[in-house]
């Protein structure tokens, strides 16, 4: 364990890329093994199973790297960081209202299907944030997060690595390429903000991530209209401008006073790691 942690500090980029590869292989492998009848009964059931297994894989990587403390919950820090994520709360609420207002009001699905949808959205946030913030961002911060330029590198690199796997949605024609590109670019921006917001606390990014997905897919979950793939296909190129607010927010979160907090935290983590 000690040797693995030491190696991950020395070769953090290699380990970050390895974590991305492991996560992607798990994603593709599990997706192919899930029984097709589950998809026909409710598309969110296999999604829930997939993300539960991906979350377990992320926790396994955290355990190997000795970083399970990231999963600790702090009520004080949670409330403070949730306020910082106010933009995500607002755009999620706006998306929710717009989607419901424009929906063809059909029959609301049964409570069981609605529960699957809610749990699925939550587990998407858990699975992706544990791996991309908990594992990958932590690896990068531990090695490069001791300087201002290093923190910026971590934020940008983490955002890019988060955006890349979203391109998988174009495989096999599951979603239109234009929509997938828009989703990937947006994921880069939101990933940068989540990384700038995250340092040693993972639960706020998880909740905000789940909220954004819940709001964006509410019509599909509530009425059964379309799937995740059809929603992604509906994105148009002009929606790429949504990345601009993310860049502005990331810059604000990395202002001088905030940067000093991050530098202090990452330096403390490095000092602790050297004694383990």
Predicted regions and their residues:
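Aromatic-anchored segments of alpha-helical transmembrane domains
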Residues: 21-29, 90-99, 159-168, 210-222
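Functionally important transmembrane alpha-helices
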Residues: 24-29, 176-235
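Residue-level signature of the transmembrane alpha-helical core
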Residues: 52, 118, 122, 126, ...
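C-terminal membrane module of polytopic membrane proteins
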Residues: 210-276
């Amino acid at each position: 364990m000690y040797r693995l942690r030491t190696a991950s500090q020395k070769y953090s980029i290699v380990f970050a890329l390895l974590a991305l590869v492991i996560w992607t292989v798990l994603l593709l492998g599990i997706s192919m093994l899930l029984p097709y009848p589950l998809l026909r009964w409710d598309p969110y059931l296999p999604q829930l199973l997939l993300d539960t297994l991906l979350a377990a894989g992320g926790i396994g990587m955290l355990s190997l790297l000795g970083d399970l403390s990231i999963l600790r919950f702090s009520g004080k820090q949670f409330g403070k960081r949730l306020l910082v994520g106010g933009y995500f709360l607002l755009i999620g609420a706006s998306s929710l209202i717009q989607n419901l207002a424009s929906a063809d009001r059909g029959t609301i699905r049964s409570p069981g299907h609605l529960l699957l949808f809610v749990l699925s959205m939550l587990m998407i946030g858990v699975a992706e944030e544990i791996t991309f913030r908990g594992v990958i961002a932590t690896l990068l911060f531990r090695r490069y997060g001791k300087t201002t330029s290093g923190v910026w590198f971590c934020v940008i690199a983490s955002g890019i690595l988060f955006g890349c796997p979203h391109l998988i949605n174009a495989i096999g024609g599951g979603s239109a390429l234009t929509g997938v590109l828009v989703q990937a670019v947006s994921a880069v921006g939101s990933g940068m903000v989540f990384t700038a917001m995250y340092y040693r606390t993972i639960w706020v990014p998880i909740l905000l991530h789940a909220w954004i997905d819940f709001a964006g897919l509410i019509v599909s979950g509530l009425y059964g209209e379309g799937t995740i793939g059809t929603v992604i296909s509906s994105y148009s190129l002009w929606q790429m401008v949504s990345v601009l607010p993310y860049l502005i927010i990331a810059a604000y979160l990395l202002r001088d006073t905030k940067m000093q907090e991050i530098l202090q935290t990452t330096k403390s983590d490095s000092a602790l790691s050297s004694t383990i």
